[in-house]
Amino acid sequence: MAKDIYFNEDARKSLLSGIEKLSNAVKVTLGPKGRNVLIDKKFGSPTVTKDGVSVAREIELDNALENMGAQLLKEVAIKTNDLAGDGTTTATVLAYAIAREGLKNVSSGINPIGIKKGIEHAVTLASEKIRKSAKKITTKEEIAQVASISANNDTSIGEKIAEAMDRVGKDGVITVEESKTFDTTISYVEGMQFDRGYLSPYFSTNKENMSVSFDDAYILICEKKISTIKELLPVLEKVLNTNKPLLIIAEDIEGDALAALVLNSVRGALKVCAIKAPGFGDRRKAMLEDIAILTGGVFVSEELGLTLENVELEQLGQAKSVKVDKDNTTIINTGNKEQIKERAELIKKQIEETSSEYDKEKLQERLAKLVGGVAVINVGAVTELELKEKKHRVEDALSATRAAVEEGVVPGGGSTLIEVAMYLDTVDTSKLSYEEKQGFEIVKRSLEEPMRQIIANAGFESSIYIHQIKTDKKGLGFDAASFKWVNMIESGIIDPAKVTRSALQNAASIAGLLLTTECAITEVKEEKSNAGGGYPMDPGMGMM
């Protein structure tokens, strides 16, 4: 395949043109007065969104070189969204501003490597300032404010997320699902729930909904596969004497072991239910250990020198209640709170140490099941189009709220970035080279862009407002929703510090790559051949 090669200014100009096109499409969504973007779909209704990353994901340009620029900027939005859950439009606006100002300097002959170093130095100082300025959030009201802003100023979504987080805790699992009604509701699952149902419907205690319900139950947690009833007899006899129900969790239960358990259950001789252990491999072992700690029992494993034949009654786990259906098992725990807390701390440490996103996600699921239960936000809407858009907003708001709980919040509406720019004005840059000073200045100027865009989207000229913010006392900003000067924190116009910091860092990273690009290589576009395969029609020949 032949390639086109572009150098110097030719390459950079086209790349910047692609960045500008994507930025223009995304920036209209910024702020409380931001507009919607309509995205065509090959099948079904078009998508309506006010979410920056959703717009960015859809953009592919016809010109290969411009498209490379657009894809670079798209990376900023996606990376910021993955890391912080929000701030994608801010990151896009910042990246374009830094790239645009930087390329002006490169075009005038200033060394791009020095400019990049200056940008990195300014961003490091700015990020640290954002971290130090952050205010920790603790109340339900503050969480609702963050969630509402991230959900495009929808207070009902903010309140639902705050309610869910208040109930399950900051480490609890909150999932978002589509509701079958028009209303958005929250449902809760207490204790630990995992996706394993009973091995036989004959274990059911409620024949109407085919489910098992036990109160004050014993739980046998076993690593191995159980094939014969002989292995289980000692523990079954001990449980039978207590007249309490028993839940058996094992790798598998089959053959005459399962048949005997079903027979005893049907006859009413023993209240029992058997399920397969959740997870696979090492994760299964870890989850069984979690269940053991949650229920105050012992994990029966031959590796630990414990076999089924010598299990004592006090080594079994206990639960206030157990509910099992064909798909799920829920255990309401009675375990030692101190041991549960220690186990949770161990899992948190593993989350910090792992580099795999998949492992991190699974560890977070385990942590949530251990400490807080699960909240499900069921999103409802009148039309399917509205439902998809609303569900996406709820997911974004949830991610941003987690970021706010993690690192705190800063004044929103772009005012924090203005304050950071003013702080950079006070930094001594005398030891920086000329090129580095230019990079430093580029960041200072670019930090104003998000607020300029928010004000422009509200229909105002930004210069007057930017000047007033710089001269007013700290913490004041322009509320584009009500067109008033307000104290941003007191008015609940706040952004997660992690979102603001990630947006700036990711924007500067991609802009720096663009500035130091000297050559771009694209594939030569093949011209489409005449599909007819015949001779062209003589212009004089009309229709017969």
Swiss-Prot record:
Membrane-crossing segments per the record: none
EC numbers on record: 5.6.1.7
Catalysis performed (reactions): ATP + H2O + a folded polypeptide = ADP + phosphate + an unfolded polypeptide
Places the protein is found: Cytoplasm
Record keywords: ATP-binding, Chaperone, Cytoplasm, Isomerase, Nucleotide-binding
Class of enzymatic activity (EC top level): isomerase
Subunit structure: Forms a cylinder of 14 subunits composed of two heptameric rings stacked back-to-back. Interacts with the co-chaperonin GroES.
Family annotation (NCBIfam families): GroEL, PRK00013.1, PRK12849.1, PRK12850.1, PRK12851.1
PANTHER family per record: 60 KDA HEAT SHOCK PROTEIN, MITOCHONDRIAL (PTHR45633)
Name of the protein described by the UniProt record: Chaperonin GroEL
